[in-house]
């Protein structure tokens, strides 16, 4: 009987072929990498950027932890003499925090690390710049996930360099607007149902007006009433004139308009109480009053005083704003207060109003006191980040709330764009005669 013979080299060719194919694919990806990154950055990141970054993290983790003082000796009580321990054994390797799976994200990657005994999340926060340098990424952000565990998020590029405006597909969810891009690459969303009142500050050419343009452009297609208070003669908010149900252009008009808004809010309270519901969202849709978004530009103009009469007006305006902030969320009245400068020197009413505005946005400001007033009571880290914004970073801001803080940049909506959007949706402007009468 003759046995069939096989060539042992035939099976050995398969590993070689696999290596050749892998080499060809890798070479091709490296060649087309620059073009792929420009045209399809997400695909480039998953195919090339993420694998290289994950390998870099795994390779440098132990040395990085030791260099940043995050390694702990296994036997600290031993005396080391001339690099030897005990009977000539080399010193034991120090313990380093363990990290989990390096998970890719749209803007980079993230991983969790378990702290060693005696370590704090702040120790990792201080090491974030070194991590970014060693891993060759744009930035690293460290947050506490739960006791003993931190989340380390890395960004391979700056998503705020050129944020892309979303494609408009209709009005979207009521009172929810995508106004820009966050540092994480996610959309920057202002949701007035979740955080009803906002304080937005920023110096000239900081991006404050652009953010307001983006917010109004997103609210204009929705079935809401927009009310403006612009005590600089209406120079800013008059762009949205066709879409505004009312616009006050000086402090006397503002006081009357705010008083009418308080009365409107109290009337809605009576309606809700009669219907046995806690807010307007509990009313039937046909009975529900239209939500009102009040935009106040340059809040300092309401509070600056030069005489007794102006002091009374400023006090009345401040009191009305505080009442709207306290009562408005449940009754469909929302505040967006903006200004170049906000400080306690404007009067106690400003501090009391600030406490009622849960959402804060701080662009580049001209004085540290404004940043302190905006963010200081929420998060000291957010305050430091806001003070680091440079004039070249127009549109970049730090946004903070009770949930934490993030950096973001608003989409570019020009004055021409804002005016066009307001005109296109002028037919959605609800008539509120009680507010119009206050301006006469």
Question: Where is each model-derived feature located?
Answer:
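Residue-level signal for secondary-structure boundary sites
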Residues: 119-121, 160-162, 198, 302, ...
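A short, charged
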Residues: 144-147, 198, 204, 210-216, ...
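P-loop NTPase catalytic phosphate-binding loop
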Residues: 1-49, 167-275, 289-372, 380-383
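Actinobacteria-biased recognition of intrinsically disordered, low-complexity terminal regions
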Residues: 1-12, 70, 80, 84-90, ...
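Glycine/charge-rich, flexible interdomain linkers and switch-proximal surface loops
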Residues: 146-154, 276-289, 340-342
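Conserved ATP-driven motor cores of ASCE-family P-loop NTPases powering translocation/secretion/packaging/pilus
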Residues: 129-130, 141-144, 150, 156-169, ...
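N-terminal "pre-motor" subdomain/linker immediately upstream of P-loop NTPase catalytic cores
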Residues: 45-171, 175-178, 185-186, 344
């Amino acid at each position: 009987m003759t046995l069939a013979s096989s060539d042992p080299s035939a099976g050995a060719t398969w590993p070689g072929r696999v290596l050749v194919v892998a080499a060809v694919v890798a070479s091709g990806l490296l060649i087309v990498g620059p073009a792929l990154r420009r045209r399809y950055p997400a695909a480039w990141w998953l195919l090339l950027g993420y694998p290289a970054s994950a390998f870099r993290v795994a390779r440098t983790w132990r040395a990085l932890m030791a260099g940043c003082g995050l390694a702990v000796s296994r036997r600290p009580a031993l005396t080391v003499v001339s690099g030897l321990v005990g009977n000539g054994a080399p010193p034991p390797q120090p313990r380093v925090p363990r990290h989990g799976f390096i998970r890719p994200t749209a803007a980079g990657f993230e991983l969790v690390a378990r702290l060693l005994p005696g370590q704090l999340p702040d120790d990792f926060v201080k090491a974030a710049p070194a991590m970014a340098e060693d891993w060759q990424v744009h930035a690293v952000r460290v947050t506490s996930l739960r006791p003993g565990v931190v989340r380390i998020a890395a960004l391979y590029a700056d998503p705020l360099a050129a944020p892309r405006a979303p494609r408009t597909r209709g009005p979207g969810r009521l009172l929810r607007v995508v106004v820009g891009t966050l540092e994480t690459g996610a959309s920057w969303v202002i949701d007035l149902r979740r955080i009803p009142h906002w304080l937005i500050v920023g110096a000239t050419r900081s991006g404050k007006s652009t953010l307001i343009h983006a917010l109004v452009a997103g609210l204009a297609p929705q079935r809401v009433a927009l009310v403006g208070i612009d005590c600089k003669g209406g120079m800013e908010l008059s762009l949205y004139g066709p879409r505004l149900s009312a616009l006050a252009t000086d402090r006397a008009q503002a006081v009357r308009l705010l008083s009418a808004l308080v009365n409107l809010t109290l009337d809605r309270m009576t309606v809700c109480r009669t219907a046995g519901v806690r807010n307007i969202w509990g009313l039937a849709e046909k009975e529900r009053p239209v939500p009102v978004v009040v935009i106040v530009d340059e809040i300092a103009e309401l509070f600056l005083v030069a005489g007794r009469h102006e002091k009374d007006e400023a006090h009345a305006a401040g009191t009305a704003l505080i009442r709207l902030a306290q009562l408005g969320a449940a009754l469909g009245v929302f505040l967006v207060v903006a200004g170049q400068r906000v400080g306690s020197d404007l009067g106690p009413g400003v501090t009391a109003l600030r406490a009622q505005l849960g959402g804060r946005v701080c662009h580049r400001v001209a004085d540290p006191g404004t940043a302190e007033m905006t963010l200081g009571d929420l998060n000291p880290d957010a305050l430091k980040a806001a003070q680091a914004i440079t004039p070249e970073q127009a549109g970049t801001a730090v946004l903070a709330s009770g949930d934490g803080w993030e950096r973001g940049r608003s989409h570019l909506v020009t004055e021409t764009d804002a005016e066009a959007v307001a005109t296109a949706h002028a037919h959605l402007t609800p008539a509120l005669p009680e507010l119009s009468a206050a301006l006469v």
